[in-house]
């Protein structure tokens, strides 16, 4: 039996460095790195931030959750 809304939701994480620099404005990076993952809505109600590898920056950067 279902207990209501599912606790797990799919979120998109985007590189904060690529977004801040304006990937297309400065032409430093050819794109914006994005990852798709799931989070538990009950355990982490705030926005998710993880350190992931950005292939455009060629280093580990903070990836923050964005709206769909």
UniProtKB/Swiss-Prot annotation:
GO process terms (BP): translation
Keyword Ribosomal protein annotated: yes
InterPro entries linked: Ribosomal_bL33 (IPR001705), Ribosomal_bL33_CS (IPR018264), Ribosomal_bL33_sf (IPR038584), Ribosomal_zn-bd (IPR011332)
GO molecular function, one term: structural constituent of ribosome
Gene Ontology cellular component terms for the protein in this record: chloroplast; ribonucleoprotein complex; ribosome
Subcellular location(s) per record: Plastid, Chloroplast
Keyword set, alphabetical order: Chloroplast, Plastid, Ribonucleoprotein, Ribosomal protein
Major location category of this protein: plastid
One Pfam family per UniProt: Ribosomal_L33
PANTHER family, A to Z: 50S RIBOSOMAL PROTEIN L33, CHLOROPLASTIC (PTHR43168), LARGE RIBOSOMAL SUBUNIT PROTEIN BL33C (PTHR43168:SF2)
Family as reported in the entry's similarity comment: Belongs to the bacterial ribosomal protein bL33 family.
The protein, known as: Large ribosomal subunit protein bL33c
Organism: Amborella trichopoda
């Amino acid at each position: 039996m279902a207990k209501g809304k599912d606790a797990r939701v799919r979120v998109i994480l985007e590189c904060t460095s690529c977004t801040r620099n304006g990937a297309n404005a400065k032409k430093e990076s050819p794109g914006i790195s994005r990852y798709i993952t799931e989070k538990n809505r009950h355990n982490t109600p705030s926005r998710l931030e993880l350190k992931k590898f950005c292939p455009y920056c060629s280093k580990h950067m903070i990836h923050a959750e964005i709206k769909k």
